[in-house]
Amino acid sequence: MKRILIALAVLLAVQVADAQTKSPEAAKKAVESAEAASKDAKKATKVATWLKLASSYMDAYNAPAGSAWLGASKQELQLIMGNDRPVSVEEVVLGTDQLIKETYSNKEFYFSPAGQLVLINVTQPVVEDALGGALEAYKKAYEVDVKQSK
């Protein structure tokens, strides 16, 4: 029984480590690497190159938000964000809703009066128009994949 619990703990630890979000710096480096590969004449003919580029753009789009998710409480976010503290905190009104806005160096979090995250606004994206870049990479992957295998 003890071995099974240890094996499950190791498996869970590996999955949690794999699920870590990329830092903005790592995401930018991954996009630059994938873009360089897509410009290589030999690699540009492979579907995997374009899928990797699209995936890198998607990671870059999601990187500034970090591990935050909508519906998270302030306490949960403080736990997962570590030393990342807001630069300023203020009360704002969006539409008819009274919200608490926490401003960070590259994003803004908006919390409901109950303390739940309801909106994430990225103020400094890792890559400009990351979603557009991902869409173009997916289109190119479709064009390159003449057998429609992927």
Where are these regions (language model features)?
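Sec/Tat signal peptide C-region and signal peptidase I cleavage site
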Residues: 13-19
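Sec-dependent N-terminal signal peptides
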Residues: 4-13
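Short coil/linker segments at helix-helix boundaries
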Residues: 56-150
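Start-of-domain marker
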Residues: 20-70
